[in-house]
Swiss-Prot record:
GO cellular component: large ribosomal subunit
GO terms under biological process: regulation of translation; translation
InterPro entries documented for this protein: Ribosom_uL1_bac-type, Ribosomal_uL1, Ribosomal_uL1-like, Ribosomal_uL1/biogenesis, Ribosomal_uL1_3-a/b-sand, Ribosomal_uL1_CS
Keyword Ribonucleoprotein attributed: yes
Name of this chain's protein: Large ribosomal subunit protein uL1
Gene behind the chain: rplA
Family: Belongs to the universal ribosomal protein uL1 family.
UniProt source species: Rippkaea orientalis (strain PCC 8801 / RF-1)
Entry superkingdom: Bacteria
Length: 238
């Protein structure tokens, strides 16, 4: 049975022409106008790429540093031992531990958005793969979350660095700020995301790489973005 649309959503939907592709800044202004829920909604990007992630040379998993931040506090957990524990604490990690933290996570403790591990701890962290993998939280070198440079990694993730990947259908879903951001700040973050996706194009990607880009507030309607206009935009213009 079709889900009944709320009055709020219908009013937001009426502001968007579903047959139109919008210039990037106009799309983000619309995103703000359609963020009418009673909380500060996230700004989301949904990017459909011409890749088939079932092939290893068509997988996309990387990180983006959002120049205007994420708009939310990011809780970082670190698995390390020895002097690296103190380094992680000094750098501002929210949760730090060794084998005991691995056991806590194994039992279901998930009070963090980012999990970083030092390389020497990865053989022990491996047991968490089935638990963390589906949640996108498993530390990985590609994601910048397996590293000996804990100070830099913690600082970057706290400041707005995000890990993302294409799902099994080749779509990237990323929260790139809050609806309370200015359109210009949202555009700076969206541009950084676009450049990162282009820079990390999988070697096996063939044909047209960019298929579609939609943005939305987390409780709002989808707004189609002009891909070429976004890619042609220079960051100095943002």
């Amino acid at each position: 049975m079709p889900k009944k649309l709320s009055k709020r959503f219908k009013e937001a939907l009426a502001k968007v022409d579903q047959n139109q592709t919008y210039a990037p800044l106009e799309a983000l202004q619309l995103l703000k106008e359609t963020a009418t829920a009673k909380f500060n909604e996230s700004a989301e990007a949904h990017i459909r790429l011409g890749i088939d992630p079932k092939y290893t040379d068509q997988q996309l998993r990387t990180t983006v540093s959002l120049p205007k931040g994420t708009g939310q506090e990011v809780r970082v957990a670190v698995i390390a031992r020895g002097e690296k524990v103190q380094e992680a604490n000094n750098a501002g990690a929210d949760i730090v531990g060794s084998e005991e933290l691995i056991e806590e996570i194994f039992k279901g403790m998930m009070d963090f958005e980012v999990l970083i591990a030092t390389p020497d701890m990865m053989p022990k962290v491996a047991k968490l793969g089935r638990l963390l993998g589906p949640r996108g939280l498993m530390p990985s070198p590609k994601g910048g979350t397996v590293t000996a440079d804990l100070t830099n990694a913690i600082t970057e993730f706290k400041a707005g660095k995000l890990e993302f990947r294409a799902d099994r259908t080749g779509i990237v879903h990323v929260m790139f700020g809050k609806a309370s951001f200015t359109p210009e700040d949202l555009l700076a973050n969206l541009k950084a995301l676009q450049e990162t996706v282009d820079r990390n194009r999988p070697s096996g990607a063939k044909g047209r790489y960019w298929r579609s880009v939609f943005v939305s507030a987390s409780m709002g309607p989808s707004i189609a973005v002009d891909i070429n206009a976004l890619r042609d935009l220079k960051l100095t213009e943002v």
